Amino acid sequence: MDIFFVISGFLITGIIITEIQQNSFSLKQFYTRRIKRIYPAFITVMALVSFIASAIFIYNDFNKLRKTIELAIAFLSNFYLGLTQGYFDLSANENPVLHIWSLAVEGQYYLIFPLILILAYKKFREVKVLFIITLILFFILLATSFVSANFYKEVLHQPNIYYLSNLRFPELLVGSLLAIYHNLSNKVQLSKQVNNILAILSTLLLFSCLFLMNNNIAFIPGITLILPCIFTALIIHTTSQNNIR
């Protein structure tokens, strides 16, 4: 999901920044587009899953499934899953809606981040300031990855940190930072040869990370996945720069 989050952050933030600069961005229209894009397919799939599960699941399992789907509609399923089911638990393989936690994280991110961008741009009128603010947010949220897992478990009652929004937002912010950087007027321009080398190296390093990281490695999203996110961003950046040329 980390690669998906980077791509999502890059694409959606790119659209937001373009519309903000053109004075055509509307939070209402943005949220309306998101709802129209996500909910029809989501509701259809969840209805089908619920119908099938009602026939083959025992009551307790179906009740958990129902709660997950209900909270997913409000973009809160990641918190419920954090309380009830670890991503790498054996029982997770039997949960047909396990992966919708990512929609919850995305929903929360795009509920907050566009508002930060539009308010900051109205005040400062500079994309450079948006980049700095986003970078500060990135480091603040990344720092929460260093908080003890016991704190999340004992204080926040979230034993499964895999799903936590504050540990996943940095992955989306990597993509957002790249999108904002592409809109800077004084960004660094690399030669096509350098871009090609960086693209190849980033691809190799990304696959190395994916190969080396497995279920046996202690998982802390912000720390464990930040390198794959950076390599993904480098691949997007170098290939997009070559396409522009």
Swiss-Prot record:
Q: Give compartment(s).
A: Cell membrane
- Main location as per UniProt: membrane
Q: What keyword terms does UniProt attach to this protein?
A: Cell membrane, Membrane, Transmembrane, Transmembrane helix
Membrane-crossing residues? 38-58, 68-88, 100-120, 129-149, 194-214, 217-237
- Please tell me whether the keyword Transmembrane helix is annotated for this protein: yes
Q: Which Pfam families match?
A: Acyl_transf_3 (PF01757)
Q: Which GO terms describe its cellular component?
A: plasma membrane
A GO molecular function assigned to this protein is: acyltransferase activity, transferring groups other than amino-acyl groups
User: What membrane topology does the annotation report for this chain?
Assistant: Multi-pass membrane protein
Q: Name the family.
A: Belongs to the acyltransferase 3 family.
The molecule here is called Uncharacterized protein HI_0392
